[in-house]
A protein has these predicted regions:
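Short, conserved micro-motifs enriched in small and acidic residues
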Residues: 73, 77, 123-124
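A glycine-rich phosphate/pyrophosphate-binding beta-strand-loop-alpha-helix module
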Residues: 108-113, 128-131
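Residues at alpha-helix boundaries and short interhelical turns
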Residues: 69, 87-90, 104, 121-124, ...
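Mid-chain, well-packed structural core segment of small domains
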Residues: 78-81, 85-111
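Short Asp/Glu-rich motifs
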Residues: 119-120, 137
Length: 142
């Protein structure tokens, strides 16, 4: 006897702190773009496992850290580019190169960040970062 397939339950955000979550969602969309964020949330909508990650990312990364008053978004983007390049996190780096451009960084500033990465983190990490940024610049016509 075949078991009836249970209807998939929609996963919904379940933040611990609604204000941090709302602030985080606003900041996340401002930096990464609403389309990217909406796609990420939609991708987690049928997966409680992934929705938990989206909650934590939105609430703490974007609501608590990125929304703090101590550093402007442009500076936070500079830090992220250097850290992601050093860690060789290609997909996230691509996302944050786009975010950095959204936050007002210039191609020249991004180049200087990755040159600094070359000295302190190594040529291979910097080369990958340059390739990633170059692809983003071409996509965006920068």
């Amino acid at each position: 006897m075949a078991k009836a397939k249970a209807k998939a339950k929609k996963a919904k955000p379940n933040p611990r702190n609604k204000k941090l979550y709302d602030d985080g969602m606003k900041m996340r969309k401002a930096v990464l773009g609403a389309g990217y964020v909406d796609n990420s949330m939609a991708g987690a909508a049928n997966d409680d496992f992934m929705m938990s990650f989206q909650d934590v990312t939105t609430e703490y990364c974007w609501g608590y850290v990125w929304s703090r008053p101590g550093l402007p978004k442009k500076t936070r983007s500079m830090l992220n580019l250097a850290m992601l390049a050093a860690l060789n996190r290609g997909p996230e780096l691509k996302l944050h190169v786009n975010g950095a451009l959204n936050n007002g960084l210039t191609k020249e500033e991004i180049k200087e960040i990755f040159l600094q990465v070359a000295i302190y983190c190594g040529i291979p990490a910097s080369l990958d970062a340059f390739k990633t940024a170059s692809a983003v610049f071409k996509e965006r016509g920068v």
